[in-house]
Amino acid sequence: MHFFDFFRGLDINEGLRKMQSTDGAVLIDVRTREEYADAHIPGSLNIPLNELQSAENRISDKSTPLFVHCLSGGRSRQAVHFLKRLGYTDVTDIGGIHHYSGKIEKGA
């Protein structure tokens, strides 16, 4: 482990393992609809960063464990801060799908 790894947070693969062992967890992909259609993690919910306000309509329980990712980690970091401002209490940034090593799906 490198010094800066401490500040980086969870790797997406580690984050997904943690999510799978968390009851009621939701995986949110904040990439654009086009990016999501090209390839996404099975079971993920696409809420693009610029539509994140709609999360309240789709996930009403603010204590739901949310695991957030994007392509490289920049948008997911922004999304985590925004979701916390909306009142969600259990939000984890798991970084970018470009480090993901599992199955992917195509299409919306």
Where are each of the predicted segments found?
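Rhodanese-like catalytic fold shared by cysteine-dependent sulfurtransferases
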Residues: 1-25, 33-64, 74-108
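N-terminal glycine-rich beta->alpha transition that marks the start or flank
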Residues: 29
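Short, surface-exposed ligand- or partner-binding patches at beta-edge/loop junctions that are enriched
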Residues: 69
